[in-house]
């Protein structure tokens, strides 16, 4: 079944309409937050009726889950395990952390809208924040923490709670992205490429946790 687009003439399939509503919802949520955005406003911006929004997403919770699923399945998704797979197989610590840092920085640069949306969700104590934590953040800690633990057993890295190492690593990357996207978009404090940032952050981390020969 198809419906007519707001512009008239062209017709949009159900899945295309669903994606359009999702994109509009992400845009509005990232600008106004969740409390400041109604389904009526989403419908108006998407050029559909509010009933059409609920036809595709029966509840707001279903819409939030669809947003995460849409981001996870998009072509520019950030999959740490896949991104670092080759370096992990070679036990290349520099390659692991540098590839992950660069991948995350590029992802944040290409999708600042989703980063703003996640900040809104956390500040408003919105359920999307917990959904994102469970679906992504927790998995990153488990995956990267597991690699660090293995390298500690092999004597390559010093003994330290792997969660602390992961927290420090993510902290450097996230702070840099937040500065570039939100606080200092003109990059007056620090203006370096993502490649350079990833390299230097990896230097700092490995100089702190590598076992000196």
Residue locations for each model-derived region?
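Short hydrophobic clusters on alpha-helical segments that form packing/core surfaces
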Residues: 21-29, 104, 205
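N-terminal intrinsically disordered/low-complexity leader segments
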Residues: 1-16, 80-87, 213
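Short secondary-structure transition hinges
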Residues: 88-90, 105-143, 188-191
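Generic hydrophobic, amphipathic alpha-helix propensity
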Residues: 17-26, 42, 67-71, 75, ...
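Hydrophobic alpha-helical connector segments
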Residues: 66, 79-113, 162-169
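Helix-turn-helix
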Residues: 20, 28-62, 66
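C-terminal peripheral helix-coil segments that are non-catalytic and often amphipathic
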Residues: 1-6, 95-106, 110, 138-154, ...
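Short, flexible, glycine-rich and Lys/Arg-enriched loop motifs at helix boundaries
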Residues: 69-93, 179-193
């Amino acid at each position: 079944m198809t419906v007519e687009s707001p512009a008239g003439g062209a017709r949009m399939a159900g899945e295309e309409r669903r994606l359009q509503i999702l994109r509009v919802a992400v845009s509005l949520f990232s600008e106004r937050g969740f409390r400041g955005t109604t389904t009526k406003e989403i419908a108006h911006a998407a050029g559909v009726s509010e009933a059409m929004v609920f036809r595709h997403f029966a509840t707001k919770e279903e819409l939030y889950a669809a947003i995460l699923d849409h981001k996870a399945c998009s072509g520019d998704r950030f999959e740490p395990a896949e991104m670092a797979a080759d370096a992990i197989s070679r036990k290349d610590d520099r390659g692991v952390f540098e590839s992950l840092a660069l991948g995350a920085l590029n992802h944040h640069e290409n999708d600042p809208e989703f980063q703003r949306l996640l900040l809104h969700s956390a500040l408003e104590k919105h359920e999307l924040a917990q959904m994102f934590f469970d679906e992504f953040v927790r998995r990153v800690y488990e995956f990267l923490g597991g690699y660090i633990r293995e390298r500690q057993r092999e004597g390559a890295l010093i003994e330290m709670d792997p969660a602390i190492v992961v927290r420090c690593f993510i902290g450097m990357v996230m702070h840099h992205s937040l500065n570039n996207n939100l606080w200092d978009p003109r990059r007056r404090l620090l203006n370096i490429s993502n490649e350079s940032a990833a390299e230097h952050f990896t230097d700092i981390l490995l100089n702190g946790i590598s076992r000196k020969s």
